[in-house]
Swiss-Prot record:
Its EC number is 3.1.-.-. It comes from Mycobacterium marinum (strain ATCC BAA-535 / M). One of its GO terms (biological process) is rRNA processing. Gene3D superfamilies: Metalloproteases ('zincins'), catalytic domain (3.40.390.30). SUPFAM superfamilies: Metalloproteases ('zincins'), catalytic domain. The keyword Transit peptide does not apply. The gene is ybeY. It is an enzyme of class 3 (hydrolase). One of its GO terms (cellular component) is cytoplasm. Zn(2+) binds at H118, H122, H128. Its cofactor is Zn(2+). Disulfide bonds: none annotated. GO terms for molecular function: metalloendopeptidase activity; RNA endonuclease activity; zinc ion binding. This is Endoribonuclease YbeY. It holds the Pfam family YbeY.
């Protein structure tokens, strides 16, 4: 899976975290592991321009998605395996997202992870134009975010335990040559 990130926003964000959450969602949604995704981070002026040009709406927004190939999660079990495809582009505005994060009482990293999930789901055909669609998409988005955060916490705890184990073994000189 290829995920490219281009940060043109002027705001320092963890590209590694963005790739991690995108990769997690793509995997959970059974998208071909050879799929490609492009993520672009823009400042508010550039995002406002894009928002007006594509959605005919004034001002910046938090996330926009531009699907390339029509991909859907899962599929019929007897269907032939689709080949790798270009999912599309997700455009994020960290400055706008920071305002939303402050209003919601969580970190910019949390907000960008949420918006990345939102963007990937749009690329996979999910929408929130109708109440039923919104309920389905937002429930899935929340579940995926919760699962990704749990996976990150577990990996962090495992890394800490591995480090403690390594230090203990070093102190015991268990691996010293006789």
């Amino acid at each position: 899976m290829s995920i490219e990130v281009s940060n043109e926003s002027g705001i320092d964000v963890s590209e590694t975290e963005l790739v991690s959450v995108a990769r997690f969602v793509i995997g959970k949604m059974d998208v071909n592991p050879g799929a490609e995704l492009s993520m672009v981070l823009l400042d508010t002026a550039a995002m406002a321009d894009l928002h007006m040009r594509w959605m005919d709406l004034p001002g910046p927004t938090d996330v926009m998605s531009f699907p390339m190939d029509e991909l859907e999660p899962g599929g019929r079990p007897d269907a032939p395996e689709p080949g790798p495809a270009m999912l599309g582009d997700i455009v994020l505005c960290p400055e706008f997202a920071a305002e939303q994060a402050a209003a919601a009482g969580h970190s910019l990293g949390h907000e960008l992870a949420l918006l990345t999930i939102h963007g990937v789901l749009h690329l996979l055909g999910y929408d929130h134009g109708e109440p039923d669609e919104e309920k389905e998409m937002f429930a899935l988005q929340d579940r995926l975010l919760e699962e990704w955060v749990a996976e990150q916490v577990q990996a962090y705890q495992q890394d800490r335990q591995d480090e403690r184990d390594r230090r203990l073994l070093d102190k015991s000189r268990y691996f010293d040559e006789p």
